[in-house]
């Protein structure tokens, strides 16, 4: 576990360290691939979302570790274990249950949701997914800039890598 990026801010009496990126490293017993995988979560999530699925199945991190990849789980700055500071990063947002259910519930608003069977309403897996959501910065542009700066530092440290993203973390 380590942190990359970030900066000191504030005045001489009250300095803060902010905008750093929390990173966990998982190395398989036998590495089979030259490039590690950096996994970067989407909005409202943390690196924990790569470790296990809401219904208890193996997460992507364990899958790739089992296949011989070194895996870096990174948390976007100002989110989760990459501390957020209100005086530096401003207000945060949080997904509402209604906004998340639009992806999973058959409410008639999205035609494709009628075919959805993975998250039947009230299912424990959906509750686990909803419970895993955290606050995030309201501006994707601000989030992207912070990830760009800290991600650059991570790549300087580890070298070339495969970047695996989810949702808001994508290109």
Describe the residue ranges of each PLM region:
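Gly/Ala-rich beta-loop-alpha elbow adjacent to hydrolase catalytic centers
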Residues: 164-170
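N-terminal cap/lid segment of alpha/beta-hydrolase-fold proteins
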Residues: 1-32
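Conserved alpha/beta-hydrolase
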Residues: 57-84
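Low-complexity, serine/threonine/proline-enriched polar segments
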Residues: 89-128
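Short beta-strand element of the alpha/beta-hydrolase
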Residues: 33-42
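Conserved acidic catalytic loop of the alpha/beta-hydrolase fold
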Residues: 125-162
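Serine-hydrolase catalytic-loop signature spanning alpha/beta hydrolases and amidase-signature enzymes
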Residues: 44-52, 71
